[in-house]
């Protein structure tokens, strides 16, 4: 792996930033998840800071106990297409589930976004952890964890094949001869698999990036295997430097099985940060935002990870209850981590719920403190980059204005974009067309 590494940075649209109740903060845009002016402001701020991309999460099921900004938010591809017309170099990464969509449509949508943005599209691949999603797609039941990842693996094979339908110079458009395309540079997929039968070809040209960037969000064994085979980047979260280093080594070591080098997959840690005038100011900001979360809301938030389990039935100030293997078919890696930390630290249900609903930011303090933390994790091979979430509604602008210049001054982060595409920003080579001889 090359040691001439450059830190990569993205940010995530996550309501008003901060915790689930941050919309109540005096400085918050209460309708941030559905306010395009706010979304535009955030994207332009990210681009001014030369960040690699903006990331839009998504979900396919809500109920009355869902996180407030999940109840009312933009569909990712739609809002990213709008941002494509406003931004010029910022990458545009959107979430779409392989469990409740079709490969042909997905390939076409992200290829269109890549053309609209002139090469800045990214797809965050998820398999949908919530059982309720099935109810919105005329399905009798939600696929189990292992099956979802088998479907995702074949789905990605199909999508990548469709993206390779056309060679780069297939469209001749010769007005004199009347030749619109070179038929020798058109390739039909004709896929027949366990889950999908897709003929192809795709009805849009090969994209500026060859293929849009593929992100994968998931830290289970199945998720890591899927990323090692197909992804350009992985979005993950570990609580400690040691855990992040172990994850980093594990994922990178799996790439060789697919004839890939460690540099071909970037690992992004999702981190919350707070930038303050000093440590006391940063702590005050955290406590102000944390105080907005009620224990009732925290229990609902915790329950979402465990298939919307009702935690209100248990005593709050006794040890976290034994709930068996609940969560294995939803957010498996997250629920395993929650149960492990509760057991190892002897936490009560109240403590677990409040920590989950308003987690303490990973990097907090002055701008220099935050930059130090990011630098340590990067240089110690715990991450290739970070997806930044503001720990309060006021944080992200300060991160761009104060932390990014420090990272640039230290030679860790570039001062300008290296090109116009997300692939160029991430330092990833153009993929070969699998059908081209």
Predicted regions mapped to residue ranges:
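N-terminal beta1-alpha1-beta2 module of alpha/beta enzyme domains
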Residues: 1-86, 209-212, 436-437
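Acidic (Asp/Glu)-rich catalytic clusters
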Residues: 2-4, 47-48, 80-88, 114-120, ...
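An alpha-helical appendage that flanks or caps ligand/catalytic pockets
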Residues: 2-17, 146-209, 242-245, 249, ...
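Hydrophobic faces of well-ordered beta-strands that scaffold small-molecule active sites
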Residues: 7-11, 54-56, 90-96, 119-125, ...
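Conserved, mostly hydrophobic/aromatic
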Residues: 9, 46, 50, 83, ...
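Active-site mouth loops of central-metabolism enzymes
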Residues: 22-37, 95-104, 140-142, 208-221, ...
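Alpha-helix-loop-beta-strand connector modules within alpha/beta enzyme cores
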Residues: 67-93, 256-258, 399-415
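Hydrophobic or amphipathic alpha-helical targeting/insertion segments
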Residues: 86-87, 91-137, 143-146, 151-155
